[in-house]
Regions:
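ATP-binding/phosphotransfer module of carbohydrate and carboxylate kinases, centering on a glycine-rich
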Residues: 1-68, 72-76, 81-117, 121-149, ...
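General beta-strand structural signal in soluble alpha/beta enzymes
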Residues: 65-66, 194-199, 233
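Short, acidic, Ser/Thr-enriched surface-loop or helix-capping motifs
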Residues: 105-106, 162, 234
Length: 405
């Protein structure tokens, strides 16, 4: 589960020190370089307490001193920055055609990024868990060899995931009521770091809000451009999770009631009209694509090449998909009033042709009297969900679950 914090607050309950360590760490992460006095002023903790907490964070290799600054009135202050050199957070994306893994340090810098083909629809949950575990073990072994310590792993899945890590329904993987967290725990052999499971779009929008081109935007929607289309939503700087943890299923809004059959069993869903599989089938009518391929990158590359060459069939398919996406986005935008809508996944290389009709459709259907939301392509590309998984681990640390010295 992801909890988005508005900012650090001093603790007034049981484990005061552990919580206040997290308060100081979060402040340094957001404001480095900073001084102990800066921390005390911002958090309300007294200077002696801050000094003691900083010593503890330095001992844990989470924070380090970087010298003095004289750009202030009074005595020069010793400045602090993030350390975290021994630590990494790992995120992993499960999709119908690939697995993606990213490891980041405490400031979000990537230290490892892998992508592997994966036949998701042809794999049983146990086989998928084994593949996830194998990739995770390889990554952990490399990171440990490089002197790193893994703080946690968050796995993103394209489907409905409850708070216990059970995948309730993932049509593009053929899963229903799969206790992935337990299955993965067995496959990993009870690792010495926490493992969690979440929805892919939720993790992707978290990544965009932290590291994307519009980082810090308080009202944002992210659309996964994979085999399926999901939406991660941040409203007023908080992630929307709904009553059961299943919001954002924009891919199953009905766009064409008499349209193609969707993987969910209904007809005319956005996924069936403008998902990457439907788009490829329309844009490349002469291709061998049969909806069962496990790596769509060659087909996406071919769509890009034909679009650049001005192929009329390809351009028409992209235009239709863009308008359908804009239509669906307008429904959500009229409800939530986002500032930015981010298209991710396979939609990124297709953005030059998808964004203009999508923006046009959104503008035409928006009821807001002023300029509507801006639709942009993700700068995180295919790795947004995995990056968001790593960010979720960092949030877990920021909540007070600090590594032991």
């Amino acid at each position: 589960m992801i909890t988005m914090q508005r900012g650090p607050q001093p603790a007034d309950f049981t484990d005061v020190r552990a919580t206040n360590l997290a308060v100081v760490l979060r402040y340094v992460r957001s404001h480095y370089p900073c001084s102990r006095a800066d921390i005390a002023t911002a958090t309300g903790l007294n200077k002696a307490t801050v000094s003691s907490l900083v010593v503890d964070l330095i001992d844990r290799h989470l924070v380090r001193e970087i010298g003095f600054t004289e750009n202030r009135i009074g005595r020069p202050a010793t400045m602090l920055t993030m350390d975290g050199s021994p630590y990494v957070a790992v995120g992993l994306e499960v999709n119908a055609d690939h697995l993606g893994l990213v490891a980041v340090d405490l400031v979000g810098a990537q230290v490892l990024a892998w992508r592997r083909s994966f036949a998701g629809l042809e794999s049983t949950p146990s086989q998928a868990a084994a593949a996830i575990a194998a990739l995770s073990r390889r990554a952990v072994a490399k990171l440990v060899k490089d002197g790193r310590r893994v703080l946690g792993l968050t796995v993103g899945v394209p489907g409905l995931v409850d708070a216990k890590g059970t995948v309730k329904f993932a049509p593009n993987l053929g899963w229903q009521e799969v206790d992935l967290l337990e299955t993965l725990g067995r496959a990993l052999g009870e690792p010495d770091f926490p493992v969690t499971v979440d929805n892919d779009a939720n993790l992707a929008v978290l990544a965009e809000s932290r590291y994307g081109s519009h980082a810090g935007t308080e009202n944002m929607i992210y659309l996964t451009g994979q085999i399926g289309i999901g939406a991660g939503i941040i409203s007023d700087d908080r992630m929307i999770r709904g009553s059961r943890g299943f919001p954002g299923e924009i891919g199953h809004l009905t766009i064409d009631p008499g349209g193609a059959l969707c993987g969910c069993g209904r007809r005319g869903c956005l996924e069936a009209v403008a998902g990457i599989g439907a788009l490829i089938a329309k844009a490349l009518p002469d291709s061998a694509y049969d909806g069962k391929l496990t790596d769509l990158q060659p087909e996406v590359d071919e769509v890009v090449q034909r679009a650049k060459a001005g192929d009329k069939v390809t351009l028409a398919a992209l235009d239709d998909a863009g308008h359908a996406l804009g239509n669906a986005v307008s429904i959500v935008a009229n409800l939530l009033d986002p500032a930015v809508v981010v298209f991710g996944g396979y939609f990124v290389p297709l953005a030059p042709w998808l964004l203009p009709p999508a923006q046009q459709e959104l503008a035409a259907r928006s009821v807001a009297p002023q300029e509507c939301a801006q639709i942009v392509a993700s700068t995180l590309g295919y790795s947004a969900t995995a990056v968001g998984g790593a960010a979720a681990v960092l949030d877990f640390i920021d909540a007070g679950n600090l590594p032991r010295p």
